[in-house]
A protein has these predicted regions:
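Short alpha-helical transmembrane segments in multi-pass integral membrane proteins
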Residues: 1-18, 76-141, 185-241, 297-363, ...
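N-terminal transmembrane alpha-helices
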Residues: 5-42, 56-71, 75, 100-107, ...
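Transmembrane helical elements of multi-pass membrane transporters/channels
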Residues: 16-35, 137, 148, 171, ...
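Transmembrane alpha-helix boundary and packing residues in multipass membrane permease domains
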Residues: 21, 25, 37, 74, ...
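Alpha-helical transmembrane segments and their lipid-water interface positions
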Residues: 28, 32-39, 62-69, 73, ...
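Helix-terminus/linker motif at the lipid-water interface of multi-pass membrane proteins
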Residues: 30-49, 118-125, 181-188, 248-277, ...
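Small-residue-rich hydrophobic transmembrane alpha-helices
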Residues: 48-108, 145-164, 271-335, 368-382, ...
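Short runs within selected transmembrane alpha-helices of multi-pass transporters and secretion channels
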Residues: 69, 138-156, 164-175, 193-208, ...
Length: 459
């Protein structure tokens, strides 16, 4: 069911729209966590390290899929808010075609460059074979990753956050069951973990695309949509390319950090792999909520209801802080139990590393959540320059501080770099948002850009 986000009390609208998104990403992260958890419990510490080591490289591919998601989602939201349904369809068609080409290129790069990428991050010899095996199967499933992300972006743009939730809930439960069967009973090791994800993502992707086209069929318009539009493609690129660059540079930064971590041995790698999965559960959840705020912002921008944007910003901050409280308490108080899920009692050093990481990062979720909400408004308003500056500042600081402190303090210096980067990145995002609000750039200038974009699309 499509939902108009331009009417109703902003706080109530956002809670109703974003909570299913939050539930969706929780399920998605659960089956990501299941990969590491089952590998660590039933195959061993090296298997956990191999999956965690490969994960940082998979984030580069996810960055491109996410860029397609947010680029399509923001533009579709704007046209849906403006009731220009023919342009909604044109945007979807254009994204699917361009996404297919991009996916094919990345698959070629991945298949031929897999070993080189693992070597570049100083992957230890004892986990090289498993890391490469996991990564190759993951790359084979890239079409499912891409088209599923595009589909969920379309659902969100149309105000439908419940359908992706149902898909992900079913897929995640199936993935966890298949992980267990493939690894525990069929003894497939790391390959079993990867194939379980491949199969479940494939089924979810096909079902999601079918439902997307059913939803599009319900949008009636006198004007005819086209299968590819260069003006629409360029609009998508103005949002997607900065998002891809931002996510890619973040992934590259994480890979650099992973290469620093790899110098401390398999135990530290395994501890980091467990902790970063738990950390990413929170960060990715907040990022997904911020994407919902981007859709809310973009729909209201398209409808010309500018006064609702700041109300949505304030409601978003309340929402993420409300969710942060139990998550911070859980990680600080029950961190040992959470990390223990990924490994057995013999992995004492790895467990200590994971617990330390969680206790350093968790209190700062209140800070980074503000940045992510602010970034959501900036993206929804197509203020990609400001968004990228704040994000790159965070990234550069984290990588630089990690490199310097790790040589002096050991691995604890790496974990300490995150809060500093988050804090300064948040301050920059808030600065750009309030400057835009004060100067009415967010309101008036974007209205002019929207008019110009509509004129370009007149046929």
């Amino acid at each position: 069911m499509n939902k108009d986000l331009t009417t109703g009390k902003p706080e109530k609208v956002l809670w109703g729209f974003c909570l299913p998104l939050f539930g969706s990403i929780i399920f998605q992260q659960l089956y990501n966590i299941a990969d590491s958890l089952i590998a660590g419990k039933f195959v061993g510490e090296n298997a956990l390290a191999a999956v965690g080591n490969s994960y940082e490289i998979t984030l580069i591919f996810i960055a491109f899929a996410f860029g397609c998601n947010i680029g399509c989602s923001v533009i579709v939201s704007r046209y849906f808010g403006a009731k220009e349904y023919h342009n909604v369809r044109t945007t979807v068609h254009t994204t699917l075609l361009s996404g297919a080409v991009l996916c094919a290129l990345l698959m070629l790069l991945g298949f031929f460059g897999c070993h080189k990428m693992l070597t570049m991050i100083h992957t230890p010899e004892e986990i090289m074979v498993d890391s490469r095996l996991y990564l190759m199967i993951y790359i084979a499933g890239l079409p499912f990753l891409f088209f599923y992300n595009i589909a969920t972006g379309i659902f969100s743009a149309l105000g439908n956050s419940k359908t992706p939730f149902v898909f992900l809930a079913c897929s995640s439960v199936a993935n966890i069951i298949m992980d267990y069967i493939f690894v525990r009973f069929l003894a497939m090791g790391v390959a079993g973990v990867a194939w379980a994800t491949f199969i479940c993502q494939g089924i979810s992707c096909v079902l999601a695309i079918v439902v997307v086209f059913r939803h599009l069929g319900a949008l009636q318009s006198e004007k005819k949509a086209v299968w590819f539009s260069m003006p629409v493609f360029l609009q998508i690129c103005t949002v997607a390319i900065p998002s891809i660059l931002q996510q890619s540079f973040v992934s590259v930064g994480n890979i650099i950090i992973q290469s620093l971590i790899n110098g401390f041995g398999a135990s530290v790698i395994a501890g980091y792999a467990a902790a970063i999965k738990l950390n990413n559960l929170v960060i990715t959840s907040f990022t997904t909520l911020a994407n919902g705020i981007s859709n809310y912002t973009s729909q209201n921008l398209g409808a010309g209801k500018y006064e609702r944007i700041h109300d949505g910003f304030k409601a978003g901050i309340k929402m993420v802080w409300t969710l942060s409280v139990p998550l911070v308490l859980l990680y600080v108080i029950a961190g040992r139990w959470m990390v223990y899920l990924f490994m057995d009692s013999s992995s004492g050093s790895a467990m200590d590393t994971g617990i330390l990481i969680l206790r350093i990062l968790a209190p700062f979720y209140f800070v980074v959540s503000v940045k992510l909400v602010t970034d959501g408004v900036l993206r929804g308003s197509s203020m990609m320059g400001a968004f990228m500056i704040a994000t790159f500042t965070d990234l550069i600081l984290r990588v630089s501080i990690a490199a310097v402190l790790s040589s002096k303090l050991g691995s604890i210096g790496i974990w300490s770099a995150w809060p500093v980067g988050w804090a300064l990145g948040t301050m920059l995002s808030l600065f750009f948002y309030f400057r835009a609000k004060k100067n009415h750039f967010l309101l008036k200038s974007r209205e002019m850009v929207q008019i110009e974009e509509e004129e370009k699309l007149e046929v």
